[in-house]
């Protein structure tokens, strides 16, 4: 076939025209002679804002060519935030969507196209900008004070200059990108310029077209005598009644390539552009807007000359044809002049037509509409009618020309090649003419080759699940048509010629089957990518996994079966080629004909080792080579027994010939070994040992609960009987020998001697070892002894799985018969829903086609995100076919016009983004008061307004949300208006809301405005005290903890006062009271002085000393005294005496929780007892010194907050604060309640474990080397999972804050509240093994830095991080393990600490804003649990279920862990616990 040198192929096209949603509907309307200019009802016009005065005007024409859906756009598909989409000119939006459909029609994926792609486009002036956007502001002020950024941004999104470059940016096109503006001829000029660019080599493919919208849209127009618009609302080109045109809306594009390149690429060619030309009228005409017939004739003649054709061969001309009395005669005059230069007589007249009679004048898109119409005429070999043509305008003098007007639909009769001209003339004089020719016969005809036999893989892509569903339905409909495309061509077009995002693969057999599968909601032959289920926009390019996720598994002995892979051998030449190569090698080594053995042999023969191992090697090697041709690569290999040799060969350890020799020798020597038997047992390796006779050995561990044992046949038979009687599942393994046991020892020397003479190389792909269960080192791989030991050693397949499944989202591909290895993987404890298995071959019992199974596997891999090269599936004669385009989401993005007031347009408001809603500042203040960061709230609001979304995920990337450099400028300007200093560059460095907030706050903190805490006379409160006060949840006066001592009645008040004076003066925290001012708290510490604050109450008369009644009376007095402490400004420590009659008195120190912790109570008890001893002995009271007092500690907190050790933990706390996925308040019926509970809204449930159950807990601690806290938290996770649901719950823990970050701070003897509070994520799951659950909690706690000290410092002292952490939700659960409460000491000492008396009143009621507070402590040898719950948030039934389930879950956890006990923990992980003899010493507790 001769290819014209300058010919350009139209390989793709798309458009939306009045009354037509796509090109197919457009042709249907043309063929039926449908006019798409409609009459508008009075109500429609009123709704559009047309006034009654206008409606009454006789000059107002109520007609318009309407385009549906101009307000709709799939913003997510193109990466536009909602607000940006709303402001973007709809002409640009439609052009974007049509450009994508045109590329799809061309079978061109820009990301895979090997060359540059240019864009030549045009749009009309933006009526949307003028009528809609700018109607919201004072037009006199738009530019009154000069251009500002937001005006520039607004014009940038609406001006016609940016149409083409917007396409290039959206699709990452690197060729020329030119906006063309020549008025009505613009889009045809764009086609001409694109052709020149292709011919000059500037680009290899080009998009060309135009977009024009009349806005306001659903309105008519005014006419007047002599105007160019029709008074009747009909466009009647060439007709005697022609009185003007009707302007309408539309968009169209074509995709162009050099004809030779299109043919070479196998493109579908719609038509050929033989040549084109443009020129201008100049001034030789009646006026600027008037046409020039001579210039029009010149441009047509030049186009003919460029095309190298004679005008007599042009049988149709799509005219500019506006239907105006002036324009039509001039156009025919020019045509006559151009065509009369021909020296060849015509055999038939040239037909004229004008699409404007159907759809009106589309302004800048008029030329592309005419071009697409003409291309459709060429494709269909038919000419539609030019509507409303009854008799010619006599001014045309058609009877004196070679032209006739097509007045009805009919075939395009032509003696030779069909050729056509398309004209478009612009106001201002730029004329364009294009010569079209029908596509070459070879390119236009569907291949005559028969449909290839066998299954096909259909691939579909979409960015949302909804779009995928629409695509499936549309493709099914296309396949169901009578003249639908060949299935192989559909598969080729979708696989090789479409861009893929979220994916779906379907294996189908014919068109009918394909349609059925596509329409089915679920089908075994359909595989859908995970992202397509969630309905969110996503891009495969961003989420596509690498080959590192893929692991190939090669099965061994026992997987073989007769006929395996026969279907692949018969249908896949690559498989057959490699099978034949291996079979020939094994025949030379062994004399065995594998073709006969594998495809036609018997099962008994194939079970022989000397046959099965070569057969498996051959099949699996050929299968691996076949899958390799599809581009599927693995990041690692695991081979099972014989399979390890296949893996090593593919990894390059053995060359193929060496591998064949090695496997042949190994199989022969194994076959010659003593016979034996093997069975698979449903027990773990430790449990099965007790059942094994002496000569039966462990052969393989496939998963922790299943293993294989082997030995002599008689002993295996007896073992099977014993296991069956014990109710333990056992099954025979198809093996004739006791593989991987000492029974193989006799062959080892000969095998190792052979291997030592072979050359082994380090692997190109990582290998896992059967011998060690871990990665093979290069040294191990090349060591013959390792390969020899593998023969007689158990296969540690479970350990190999343990290694690969530790990584998330692994895809395990079984490269061999059946699915035994992937089945073991799915039973492994580390298997999760993020992992996937794929089997390349069928199970022997499945009656399915081998190739069907293989293609299903490829489809499943592809849908999982693995790159698959579908080239091997390309038909012998591939043919690109037309298929439905992407179903864009029809979402409205529109700003309605405002005809009454001037306000600010969205996205254009005098220098800042869309205006702040009333009350936003108040909302910010409220948010700040609720503990949220004011900076973040402000930035959240700015981002939301600029992006046009209601909320912004604080960890979402600004640019992933659709942000760009211009929007970054908008955000910086809006932030400046809020008093925040941000540069556009900051958005690149800190692209998330969280990171930007931290950066802004850090900048503020470094500005030097903060007053150093050391300069303050009264120090600010430390972070944990701030935690208490910041929430404002409890009456600070009531939150007191008692410290109770029994005193001998002979101890008098002077002694008590002396002791108290010494102790209170020794510890400054006991002289503390807080002063609050507008939410800012200071600590005031009184000077040392004699202690006078002592109250005295007596037990009522008649109560016997030492009786239970006396103790109850004392407790009542103490509880009453504690309740009386309601003055928030009073000192935080008070002392009371409860005097008994004749028995001991009780001294109660009521100390506020904010100045004492468990260690403080121990220090105070020791000091008081010491002081009493010294006083009663007549000695001076001298207490052990305090190194760092409370006041000094408080002053140092600010410095500690900026200590590197604290700052280094920022990322840890920020990351961990967002891990929770389960919130009790959300998972349970009651809504989340932000306000703190009152005392009467809290309820306590208590339970006690028996001494025996508590001992069991101690035994578990010693066995597993895990702390009591770890075991209790693991049980709590199980309890929540069983009663509420599975997920990750945020739990607040308490830590010991006395281990500080600076060596010059010593708090070991300091009285004060140093408890740290910090959140940890707790996984709540029911399916996790006990040891795994303990390990998970242990690792979580072990990762907590510095006992959680840094969290409080960063949360309450270091402002930048404080705002970030403060925005996080309060954990639902507070958990505290208080350790051992010592029992009442015996003896007659005059002063004794009374823990037994303290216990009932020692803790204040909770109220820190948690839904549940669980307090656990040891007392009297038993474990006690107090469940406090907020009755507004937690139903009583749920709380009772938690309280009831916890002991059961704890016991089950310990029992399970003991059953699966292991001792692999490092000694460094042994953790201590508070034990008897210490009140509570949290500093002795490790983190996990």
From Swiss-Prot:
<dbReference type="Pfam" id="PF16197">
    <property type="entry name" value="KAsynt_C_assoc"/>
</dbReference>
<dbReference type="InterPro" id="IPR009081">
    <property type="entry name" value="PP-bd_ACP"/>
</dbReference>
<dbReference type="InterPro" id="IPR020841">
    <property type="entry name" value="PKS_Beta-ketoAc_synthase_dom"/>
</dbReference>
<dbReference type="InterPro" id="IPR014030">
    <property type="entry name" value="Ketoacyl_synth_N"/>
</dbReference>
<dbReference type="GO" id="GO:0004315">
    <property type="term" value="F:3-oxoacyl-[acyl-carrier-protein] synthase activity"/>
</dbReference>
<dbReference type="Pfam" id="PF00109">
    <property type="entry name" value="ketoacyl-synt"/>
</dbReference>
<dbReference type="Pfam" id="PF00668">
    <property type="entry name" value="Condensation"/>
</dbReference>
<dbReference type="GO" id="GO:0008610">
    <property type="term" value="P:lipid biosynthetic process"/>
</dbReference>
<keyword id="KW-0597">Phosphoprotein</keyword>
<keyword id="KW-0596">Phosphopantetheine</keyword>
<keyword id="KW-0521">NADP</keyword>
<dbReference type="GO" id="GO:0071766">
    <property type="term" value="P:Actinobacterium-type cell wall biogenesis"/>
</dbReference>
<feature type="binding site">
    <location>
        <begin position="1286"/>
        <end position="1331"/>
    </location>
    <ligand>
        <name>NADP(+)</name>
    </ligand>
</feature>
<dbReference type="InterPro" id="IPR050091">
    <property type="entry name" value="PKS_NRPS_Biosynth_Enz"/>
</dbReference>
<dbReference type="GO" id="GO:0034081">
    <property type="term" value="C:polyketide synthase complex"/>
</dbReference>
<dbReference type="InterPro" id="IPR032821">
    <property type="entry name" value="PKS_assoc"/>
</dbReference>
<dbReference type="InterPro" id="IPR001242">
    <property type="entry name" value="Condensatn"/>
</dbReference>
<protein>
    <recommendedName>
        <fullName>Phenolphthiocerol/phthiocerol polyketide synthase subunit E</fullName>
        <ecNumber>2.3.1.292</ecNumber>
    </recommendedName>
</protein>
<feature type="modified residue" description="O-(pantetheine 4'-phosphoryl)serine">
    <location>
        <position position="965"/>
    </location>
</feature>
<dbReference type="GO" id="GO:0005886">
    <property type="term" value="C:plasma membrane"/>
</dbReference>
<dbReference type="GO" id="GO:0009274">
    <property type="term" value="C:peptidoglycan-based cell wall"/>
</dbReference>
<feature type="region of interest" description="Acyltransferase">
    <location>
        <begin position="551"/>
        <end position="868"/>
    </location>
</feature>
<feature type="modified residue" description="N-acetylserine">
    <location>
        <position position="2"/>
    </location>
</feature>
<keyword id="KW-0808">Transferase</keyword>
<keyword id="KW-0443">Lipid metabolism</keyword>
<feature type="active site" description="For beta-ketoacyl synthase activity">
    <location>
        <position position="184"/>
    </location>
</feature>
<dbReference type="InterPro" id="IPR018201">
    <property type="entry name" value="Ketoacyl_synth_AS"/>
</dbReference>
<feature type="active site" description="For beta-ketoacyl synthase activity">
    <location>
        <position position="361"/>
    </location>
</feature>
<dbReference type="InterPro" id="IPR016035">
    <property type="entry name" value="Acyl_Trfase/lysoPLipase"/>
</dbReference>
<feature type="active site" description="For malonyltransferase activity">
    <location>
        <position position="641"/>
    </location>
</feature>
<dbReference type="InterPro" id="IPR016039">
    <property type="entry name" value="Thiolase-like"/>
</dbReference>
<dbReference type="Pfam" id="PF00550">
    <property type="entry name" value="PP-binding"/>
</dbReference>
<dbReference type="InterPro" id="IPR036736">
    <property type="entry name" value="ACP-like_sf"/>
</dbReference>
<dbReference type="GO" id="GO:0071770">
    <property type="term" value="P:DIM/DIP cell wall layer assembly"/>
</dbReference>
<dbReference type="GO" id="GO:0004312">
    <property type="term" value="F:fatty acid synthase activity"/>
</dbReference>
<feature type="domain" description="Ketosynthase family 3 (KS3)">
    <location>
        <begin position="5"/>
        <end position="438"/>
    </location>
</feature>
<keyword id="KW-0511">Multifunctional enzyme</keyword>
<dbReference type="Pfam" id="PF00698">
    <property type="entry name" value="Acyl_transf_1"/>
</dbReference>
<comment type="subunit">
    <text>The C-terminal region interacts with TesA. Interacts with MmpL7.</text>
</comment>
<dbReference type="GO" id="GO:0031177">
    <property type="term" value="F:phosphopantetheine binding"/>
</dbReference>
<keyword id="KW-0007">Acetylation</keyword>
<keyword id="KW-0276">Fatty acid metabolism</keyword>
């Amino acid at each position: 076939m001769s290819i014209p040198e300058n010919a350009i192929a139209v390989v793709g096209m798309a458009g939306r025209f009045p009354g037509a949603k796509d090109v197919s509907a457009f042709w249907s309307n043309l063929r039926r002679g449908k006019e798409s200019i409609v009459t508008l009802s009075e109500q429609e016009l009123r709704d559009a804002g047309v006034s009654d005065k206008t409606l009454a005007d006789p000059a107002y024409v109520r007609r318009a060519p309407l385009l549906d859906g101009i307000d709709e756009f799939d913003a997510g598909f193109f990466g536009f935030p909602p607000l940006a989409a709303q402001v973007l000119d709809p002409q640009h939006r439609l052009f974007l969507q049509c450009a994508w459909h045109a590329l799809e029609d061309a079978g061109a994926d820009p990301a895979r196209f090997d060359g540059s792609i240019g864009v030549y486009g045009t749009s009309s002036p933006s009526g949307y900008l003028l009528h809609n956007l700018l109607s919201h502001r004072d037009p006199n002020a738009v530019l009154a004070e000069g251009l500002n950024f937001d005006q520039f941004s607004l014009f940038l999104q609406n001006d016609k200059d940016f149409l083409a470059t917007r396409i290039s940016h959206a699709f990452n096109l690197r060729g020329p990108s030119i906006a063309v503006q020549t008025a009505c001829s613009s889009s045809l000029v764009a086609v001409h310029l694109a052709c020149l660019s292709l011919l000059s080599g500037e680009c290899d493919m080009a998009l060309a077209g135009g977009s024009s919208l009349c806005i306001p849209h659903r309105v008519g127009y005014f006419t007047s005598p002599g105007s160019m618009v029709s008074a009747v609302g009909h466009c009647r080109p060439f007709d005697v009644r022609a009185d003007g045109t009707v302007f309408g809306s539309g968009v169209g594009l074509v995709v162009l390539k050099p004809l030779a390149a299109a043919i070479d690429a196998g493109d579908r060619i719609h038509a050929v552009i033989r040549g084109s030309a443009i020129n201008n009228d100049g001034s030789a005409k009646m006026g600027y807007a008037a046409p020039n017939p001579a210039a029009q004739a010149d441009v047509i003649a030049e186009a003919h000359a460029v095309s190298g054709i004679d005008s007599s061969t042009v049988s149709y001309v799509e005219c500019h044809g506006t239907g105006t009395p002036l324009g039509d005669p001039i156009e025919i005059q020019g045509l006559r002049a151009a065509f009369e230069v021909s020296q060849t007589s015509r055999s038939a007249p040239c037909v004229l037509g004008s699409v404007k009679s159907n759809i009106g004048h589309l302004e800048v898109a008029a030329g592309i509409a005419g071009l697409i119409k003409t291309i459709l005429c060429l494709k269909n070999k038919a000419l539609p009618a030019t509507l409303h043509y009854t008799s010619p305008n006599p001014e045309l003098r058609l009877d004196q020309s070679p032209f006739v007007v097509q007045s009805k639909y009919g075939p395009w009769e032509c003696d030779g090649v069909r050729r056509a001209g398309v004209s478009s003339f612009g106001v201002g004089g730029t004329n364009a003419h294009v010569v079209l020719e029908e596509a070459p016969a070879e390119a236009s005809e569907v291949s005559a080759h028969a449909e290839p036999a066998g299954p096909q893989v259909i691939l579909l892509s979409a960015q949302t699940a909804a779009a995928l569903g629409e695509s499936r339905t549309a493709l099914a409909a296309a396949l169901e048509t009578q003249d639908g495309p060949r299935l192989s061509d559909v598969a080729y077009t979708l696989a090789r010629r479409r861009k893929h995002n979220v994916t779906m693969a379907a294996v189908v057999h014919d068109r009918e089957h394909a349609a059925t599968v596509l329409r089915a909601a679920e089908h075994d032959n359909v595989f859908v990518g995970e992202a397509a289920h969630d309905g969110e926009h996503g891009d495969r390019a961003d989420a596509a996994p690498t080959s590192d996720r893929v692991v190939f598994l090669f099965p061994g002995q026992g997987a073989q079966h007769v006929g395996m892979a026969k279907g692949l051998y018969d249908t896949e030449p690559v498989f057959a080629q490699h099978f034949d190569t291996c079979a020939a090698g094994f025949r030379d080594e062994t004399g065995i004909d594998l073709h006969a053995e594998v495809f036609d042999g018997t099962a008994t023969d194939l079970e022989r080792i000397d046959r099965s191992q070569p057969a498996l090697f051959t099949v699996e090697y050929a299968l691996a080579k076949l899958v390799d041709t599809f581009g599927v690569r693995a990041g690692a290999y695991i081979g099972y027994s014989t399979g390890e040799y296949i893996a090593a060969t593919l990894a390059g350890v053995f060359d193929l010939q060496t591998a064949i020799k090695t496997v042949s020798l190994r199989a022969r020597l194994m076959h010659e070994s003593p016979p034996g038997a093997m069975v698979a047992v449903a027990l773990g390796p430790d449990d099965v040992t007790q059942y094994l006779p002496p000569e039966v050995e462990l052969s393989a561990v496939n998963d922790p609960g299943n293993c294989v044992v082997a030995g002599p046949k008689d002993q295996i038979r007896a073992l099977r009987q014993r296991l069956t009687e014990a109710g333990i599942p056992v099954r025979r393994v198809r093996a004739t020998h006791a593989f991987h046991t000492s029974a193989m020892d006799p062959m080892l020397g000969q095998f190792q001697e052979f291997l030592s003479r072979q050359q082994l190389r380090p692997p190109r792909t990582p290998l896992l070892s059967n011998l060690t269960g871990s990665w093979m080192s290069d040294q191990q791989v090349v060591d013959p002894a390792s390969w020899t030991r593998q023969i007689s050693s158990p296969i540690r397949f479970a350990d190999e799985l343990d290694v690969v499944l530790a990584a998330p989202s692994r895809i395990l591909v079984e490269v061999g018969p059946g699915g035994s290895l992937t089945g073991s993987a799915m039973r492994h404890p580390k298997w999760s829903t993020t992992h996937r298995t794929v089997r390349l071959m069928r199970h022997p019992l499945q009656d399915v086609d081998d190739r069907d199974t293989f293609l299903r596997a490829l489809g499943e891999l592809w849908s999982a995100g693995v790159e698959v090269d579908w080239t091997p599936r390309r038909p012998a004669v591939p043919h690109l076919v037309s298929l439905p385009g992407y179903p864009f989401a029809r979402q409205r993005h529109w700003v309605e016009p405002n005809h009454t007031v001037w306000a600010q347009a969205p996205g254009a408001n005098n220098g800042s983004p869309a205006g702040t809603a009333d009350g936003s500042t108040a909302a910010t203040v409220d948010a700040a008061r609720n503990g949220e960061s004011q900076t973040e709230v402000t930035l959240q609001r700015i981002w939301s307004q600029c992006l046009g979304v209601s909320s912004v995920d604080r960890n979402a990337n600004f640019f992933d949300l659709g942000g760009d450099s211009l929007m970054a400028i908008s955000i910086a300007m809006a932030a400046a208006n809020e008093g925040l200093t941000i540069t556009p560059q900051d958005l690149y460095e800190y692209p998330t809301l969280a990171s930007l907030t931290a950066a802004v706050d850090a900048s503020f903190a470094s500005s030097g405005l903060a007053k150093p805490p050391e300069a303050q006379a009264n120090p600010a409160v430390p972070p944990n005290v701030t935690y208490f006060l910041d929430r404002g949840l409890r009456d600070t006066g009531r939150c007191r903890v008692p410290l109770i001592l029994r005193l001998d009645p002979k101890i008098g008040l002077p002694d008590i006062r002396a002791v108290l004076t010494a102790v209170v003066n020794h510890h400054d925290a006991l002289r503390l009271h807080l002063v609050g001012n507008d939410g800012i708290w200071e600590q005031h510490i009184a000077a040392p002085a004699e202690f006078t604050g002592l109250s005295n109450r007596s037990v009522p008369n008649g109560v016997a000393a030492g009786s239970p009644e006396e103790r109850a009376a004392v407790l009542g007095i103490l509880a009453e005294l504690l309740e009386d402490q309601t003055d928030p400004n009073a000192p935080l420590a008070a002392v009371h005496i409860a005097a008994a009659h004749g028995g001991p008195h009780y001294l109660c120190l009521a100390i506020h929780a904010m100045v004492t912790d468990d260690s403080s109570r121990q220090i105070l008890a020791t000091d008081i007892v010491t002081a009493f001893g010294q006083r009663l002995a007549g000695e001076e009271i001298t207490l052990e010194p305090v190194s760092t007092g409370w006041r000094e500690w408080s002053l140092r907190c600010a410095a500690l907050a900026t200590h590197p050790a604290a700052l280094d933990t920022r990322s840890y706390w920020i990351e961990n604060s967002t891990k929770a996925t389960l919130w009790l308040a959300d998972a349970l019926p009651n809504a989340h309640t932000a306000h703190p509970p009152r005392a009467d809204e809290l309820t306590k449930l208590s339970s006690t474990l028996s001494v025996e159950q508590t001992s069991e807990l101690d035994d578990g601690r010693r066995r597993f080397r895990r702390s009591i806290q770890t075991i209790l938290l693991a049980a709590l996770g199980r309890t929540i999972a069983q009663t509420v649901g599975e997920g990750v719950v945020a739990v607040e823990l308490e830590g010991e804050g006395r281990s500080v970050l600076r060596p010059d701070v010593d708090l070991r003897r300091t009285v004060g509240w140093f408890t740290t509070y910090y959140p940890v994520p707790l996984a709540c799951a029911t399916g996790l093994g006990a040891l795994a659950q303990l390990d998970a909690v242990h690792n979580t706690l072990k990762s907590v830095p510095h006992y959680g000290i840094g969290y409080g410092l960063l949360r309450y002292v270091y402002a930048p991080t404080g705002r970030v952490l403060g925005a996080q939700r309060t954990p639902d659960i507070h958990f505290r393990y208080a350790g051992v409460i010592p029992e009442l000491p015996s003896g007659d000492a005059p002063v004794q600490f009374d823990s037994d008396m303290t216990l009932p009143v020692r803790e204040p009621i909770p109220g820190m804003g948690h839904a549940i507070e669980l307090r656990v402590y040891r007392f009297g040898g038993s474990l006690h649990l107090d469940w406090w719950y907020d009755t507004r948030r937690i139903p009583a039934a749920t709380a009772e279920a938690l309280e009831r389930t916890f002991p059961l879950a704890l016991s089950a956890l310990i029992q399970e862990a003991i059953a699966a006990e292991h001792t692999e923990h490092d000694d460094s992980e042994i953790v201590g616990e508070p034990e008897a003899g210490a009140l509570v010493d949290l500093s002795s507790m490790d983190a996990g």
